[in-house]
From Swiss-Prot:
Protein's GO biological process: L-histidine biosynthetic process
Pathway the protein acts in: Amino-acid biosynthesis; L-histidine biosynthesis; L-histidine from 5-phospho-alpha-D-ribose 1-diphosphate: step 6/9
Compartments reported by the entry: Cytoplasm
EC number(s) given by UniProt: 4.2.1.19
Gene Ontology MF terms in the entry: imidazoleglycerol-phosphate dehydratase activity
Source species: Burkholderia mallei (strain ATCC 23344)
Protein name: Imidazoleglycerol-phosphate dehydratase
Gene encoding the protein: hisB
Lineage, uppermost ranks: Bacteria, Pseudomonadati, Pseudomonadota, Betaproteobacteria, Burkholderiales
Entry-linked Pfam families: IGPD
Similarity comment: family membership: Belongs to the imidazoleglycerol-phosphate dehydratase family.
Disulfide-linked positions: none
Length: 195
């Protein structure tokens, strides 16, 4: 079973993440940031990973620390659940539309953190959620999961649709990348022999 639990406690946030990479999309989400919960639900459902995330943060200031630290802790949990990366497909990609919006996400479990985030948001907020926090979420994730991640919103007018397609595509790309390839069982997916 590829499961992991990570707890992160700082002076700003207290976060617990449990993940099962071979789940069915079940989720229990309580971050204190409703729109973030909605986006994390997309990862669980479209990535077919089970997620249990609880966060308490200094949201009386703003949502920045909570959103970023959930990304960090989720990245740590994914890295722990994937382990030595033997037998995984390593690469994943997905295109996801939602009405007028279309996004592409490509991920590489390379061991080299990197983020290319290109989303020309059409507004600064979705309800009370600051769209800039999505960058902080994914930056925290890649730095602690050890992945390279390319995110491109190819078109979109509605900012909610833009970001929802990003999170759905991320879930599907993650699912593809961590899937076990029976033809490569026990092998590191690299000609170098390590990641």
């Amino acid at each position: 079973m590829r499961v992991a639990q990570v707890v992160r406690n700082t002076s700003e946030t207290q976060i617990s993440v449990k993940i099962d990479l071979d789940g069915t999309g079940r989720q229990k989400l309580a971050t204190g940031v409703p729109f973030l919960d909605h986006m994390l639900d997309q990862i669980a459902r479209h990535g077919l990973v089970d997620l249990d995330i609880e966060a308490h943060g200094d949201t009386h200031i703003d949502d920045h620390h909570t959103v970023e630290d959930v990304g960090i802790t989720l990245g740590q949990a994914v890295a722990k659940a994937v382990g030595d990366r033997k037998g995984i497909r390593r690469y994943g990609h997905s295109y996801v539309p939602l009405d007028e919006a279309l996004s592409r996400v490509v991920i590489d479990f390379s061991g080299r953190p990197g983020l290319e985030f290109h989303v020309p948001f059409t507004r600064a907020r979705i309800g009370t959620f600051d769209v800039d926090l999505s960058i902080e979420f994914f930056r925290g994730f890649v730095n602690h999961a050890g992945v390279t991640l390319h995110i491109d919103n190819l078109r979109g007018v509605n900012a909610h649709h833009q970001l929802e397609t990003v999170f759905k595509a991320f879930g599907r790309a993650l699912r593809m990348a961590v899937e076990l390839d029976e033809r490569a069982a026990g092998q590191i997916p690299s000609t170098k022999g390590s990641l």
